[in-house]
UniProtKB/Swiss-Prot annotation:
It comes from the Bacteria. Keywords: Acyltransferase, Biotin biosynthesis, Pyridoxal phosphate, Transferase. It is an enzyme of class 2 (transferase). Its EC number is 2.3.1.47. Pyridoxal 5'-phosphate binds at G114, Y115, S187, D212, D213, A214, H215, T232, L233, S234, K235. Catalyzes the decarboxylative condensation of pimeloyl-[acyl-carrier protein] and L-alanine to produce 8-amino-7-oxononanoate (AON), [acyl-carrier protein], and carbon dioxide. Gene3D superfamilies: Aspartate Aminotransferase, domain 1, Type I PLP-dependent aspartate aminotransferase-like (Major domain). Homodimer. Belongs to the class-II pyridoxal-phosphate-dependent aminotransferase family. BioF subfamily. The modification N6-(pyridoxal phosphate)lysine is found at K235. This is 8-amino-7-oxononanoate synthase.
Length: 383
């Protein structure tokens, strides 16, 4: 068969890109140089960033950098192998011990990222003949892990405990095992799961619960712990990686069965050392940990928005084009607030996702609020 130019790989990609462009959904990588104190440089502009998950500003903390530098000099730039071969460095082992203690669990397991953690956890615990119930606004990696498990996967409406109960009543009797997946703080809306009610349902229906704490660690009160507590090292802890905290038997099982741990290189020792030092700071500086939520609530009060439940505040715009235009207008005024568009959020709910950090000051927060009141009065109302 002779090649068909219209069916080439480049033609296929070009057609798909044209469709994304027409819908204002094409993504582009923008080089961004992050600095301390919420500073960022992009496109030759010096900006104040409100689009970073470094909630405590620890990525630039001299103590965290010093810990990473020391580990880099001692252990090298990379782990060099899978953790089950020779890639299980001393900083990794120390970090797992501290994470488990912080979460009140027997053990912890560190993965290469939060996404990799969730790709590995569900398939190691459930499979065909089992049931997964997942909040419809759960992160993409929760859905990816559920799909890889081959368990029956059913979505429940966001934070809808009544529907979750109904689905458990409908499906639990025919499933060997059941796993509920949710988030402590939802990454795009900044709201929180009703964990006491969810955990009570899990107990009633003999189900396990995994809580993704990627955006909650260290910046919101944890409340009741789930049997499976996973999260990332890349947000509050300012480093890179993911983890699961659970009982020792569960961690032992995942060490053998989580494919996203077994078949990939271990986390660089410097990343583990940085996260360990950051966890020290989280535990010993509670006033710093409280600051992002306080700033978020200052912002929502200023704009008359519902009180923030976390350091994440969505400013809903609607159309993707309008969200992009508002982001561009804010950048011209010195603020970096990236537009979030489908498929990350549902169609018609494009938004600015404003993320607050201990590195921000009140003046920066107030200035952003005033700019939004002027540029997007239909999306906010001055309080």
């Amino acid at each position: 068969m002779s090649p068909n130019p219209s069916n080439s790989l480049d033609a296929f990609a070009g057609e798909k890109l044209a469709g994304l462009e027409a819908s204002a959904l094409r993504r582009r990588l923008a080089v961004t140089a992050r600095g301390p104190e919420a500073a960022a440089e992009r496109g030759g502009r010096s900006l104040v960033s409100f689009s970073c998950n470094d909630y405590l500003g620890l990525a630039h903390d001299p103590r965290v950098i010093a810990a990473a530098t020391e580990a880099l000099a001692r252990y090298g730039a990379g782990a060099g192998a899978s953790r089950l071969v020779t890639g299980n460095s001393p900083p990794l082992a120390a970090l797992e011990e501290r994470l488990a203690r912080h979460k009140g669990k027997e053990a912890a397991l560190v993965f290469g990222s939060g996404y990799l953690a969730n790709l590995g956890i569900a398939p190691a615990l459930v499979g065909a003949g089992d049931l997964i119930l997942i909040d419809e606004l759960g992160h993409s990696c929760l859905f990816a892990g559920a799909a890889m498990s081959r368990a029956q996967t059913v979505r429940f409406a966001h934070n809808d405990v009544a529907q979750l109960r109904a689905l458990l009543a409908e499906h639990r009797g025919t499933a060997r095992r059941a796993l509920i997946l949710t988030e402590r703080v939802f990454s795009m809306d900044g709201d929180r799961a009703p964990l006491p009610e969810i955990l009570a349902l899990a107990g009633e229906y003999d189900a396990w619960t995994l809580v993704d704490d990627a955006h909650g660690l260290g910046v919101v009160e944890p409340g009741q712990r789930a049997p499976l507590e996973m999260g990332t090292l890349s947000k509050t802890l300012g480093s890179y990686g993911g983890y699961l905290c659970a009982s020792q038997p569960v961690i032992d099982l995942l060490t053998s069965r989580a494919r996203s741990l077994v078949y990939t290189t271990g986390l660089p020792p410097a990343s583990a050392a940085a996260a360990l030092k950051a966890l020290d700071i989280v535990e010993t500086e509670p006033e710093r940990a409280a600051r992002p939520l306080a700033l978020a609530r200052r912002f929502t009060a200023r704009l008359g928005l519902p009180e923030a439940m976390s350091p994440i505040v969505p400013v809903l715009i609607g159309a993707a084009e309008a969200a992009l235009a508002l982001s561009t207008a804010l950048e011209a005024r010195g603020f970096l607030v990236v537009a979030i568009r489908p498929p990350t959020v549902a169609p018609g709910t494009a938004r600015l996702r404003v993320a607050f950090s201990a590195a921000h000051d009140e003046g920066q927060v107030d200035a952003l609020a005033e700019a939004l009141i002027e540029l997007a009065p239909e999306s906010v109302r001055a309080g």
